[in-house]
């Protein structure tokens, strides 16, 4: 009995009097038990279910009543497979979700790999672009020479400067000192030429000045050529593979010849 003389859901569906010790009373309430027991009675039969519950221990009866009720409702939806069809559908759903999870993991790993490769490729492109820019500006050979000689001077320093010990600033100072020495030598040559013309008693001042200037220019050109030849031998002994030294010498010779 469910209390106050009300029958249980099974007895209500069977339209019988619910007696004390009814095997269905603890598991089928008066309000909703009738609908649940209707499926059980249609699939298994009330007498078969009562015998099954009576043979089970009291501790196992609640779980058995729930299982029987679920199986009866599944059999009404699928008379052939019952709850097996629902279990199979759940297994298929689990397999589909596992395949999707594996695909997402593989895609994530591939994306990380492509990101690392892209970063490495980008760094290589930037390095190649920087090297190409250095070669275009004339810094490539200088950087290679500094690396082979242990020099740490940056590429932004004078690309055409040379020195015997690998320093860019020292080479620039050597060229500056050489040009200054040539200028001083030309001035001294002009001074001695004019003294010589005055001592010789030249009558025509214009011709004397021209002759003195020509002699001084020729003397200074010879002196500058000797100086450049000496420095060229030093530069060629210290760094034998540079075309910029010859370019600088040709520029200096052109300047002296025009003067």
Curated annotation (Swiss-Prot):
Which residue range or ranges hold the LOB domain?
Answer: 6-108
Record keywords, A-Z: Developmental protein, Nucleus
Q: What's the main place this protein lives?
A: nucleus
Q: What biological-process terms (Gene Ontology) are attached?
A: adventitious root development; hormone-mediated signaling pathway; lateral root formation; positive regulation of DNA-templated transcription
Tell me the tissue specificity. Expressed in unelongating basal internodes, at the base of shoot in parenchyma cells adjacent to the peripheral vascular cylinder of the stem, and root pericycle cells. Expressed in lateral and adventitious root primordia, tiller primordia, vascular tissues, scutellum, and young pedicels.
**Localization:** Nucleus
List the Pfam families: LOB
InterPro entries xrefs: LOB
Key word Nucleus present: yes
Q: Name one GO molecular function term.
A: protein homodimerization activity
Q: Which family does it belong to?
A: Belongs to the LOB domain-containing protein family.
- Record text on subunit structure and interactions: Can form homodimers.
Which PANTHER family does the record associate with it?
LOB DOMAIN CONTAINING PROTEIN, LOB DOMAIN-CONTAINING PROTEIN CRL1
Q: Please report the name of this protein according to its UniProt entry.
A: LOB domain-containing protein CRL1
What is the species of this protein?
Answer: Oryza sativa subsp. japonica
Task: Tell me what gene encodes this.
Answer: CRL1
């Amino acid at each position: 009995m469910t209390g106050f003389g009300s029958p249980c859901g099974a007895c209500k569906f069977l339209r019988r009097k619910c007696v004390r010790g009814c095997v269905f009373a603890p598991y089928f309430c008066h309000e909703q038990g009738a609908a649940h027991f209707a499926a059980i009675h249609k699939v298994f039969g009330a007498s078969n279910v009562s015998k099954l519950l009576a043979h089970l221990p009291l501790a196992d009866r609640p779980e058995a009543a729930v299982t029987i009720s679920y199986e009866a409702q599944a059999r009404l939806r699928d008379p052939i497979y019952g709850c097996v069809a629902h279990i199979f559908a759940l297994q298929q759903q689990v397999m589909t979700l596992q395949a999707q999870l594996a695909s997402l993991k593989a895609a994530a790993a591939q994306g990380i790999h492509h990101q690392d490769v892209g970063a490495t490729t980008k760094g290589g492109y930037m390095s190649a672009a920087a090297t190409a820019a250095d070669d275009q500006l004339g810094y490539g050979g200088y950087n290679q020479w500094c690396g082979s000689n242990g020099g740490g001077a940056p590429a932004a320093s004078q690309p055409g400067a040379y020195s015997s010990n690998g320093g860019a600033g020292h080479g620039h100072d050597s060229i500056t000192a050489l040009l200054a020495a040539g200028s001083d030598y030309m001035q001294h040559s002009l001074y001695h030429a004019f003294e010589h013309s005055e001592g010789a008693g030249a009558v025509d001042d214009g011709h004397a000045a021209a002759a003195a200037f020509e002699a001084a220019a020729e003397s200074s050109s010879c002196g500058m050529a000797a100086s450049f030849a000496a420095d060229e031998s030093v530069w060629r002994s210290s760094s034998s593979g540079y075309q910029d030294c010859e370019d600088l010498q040709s520029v200096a010779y052109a300047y002296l010849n025009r003067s």
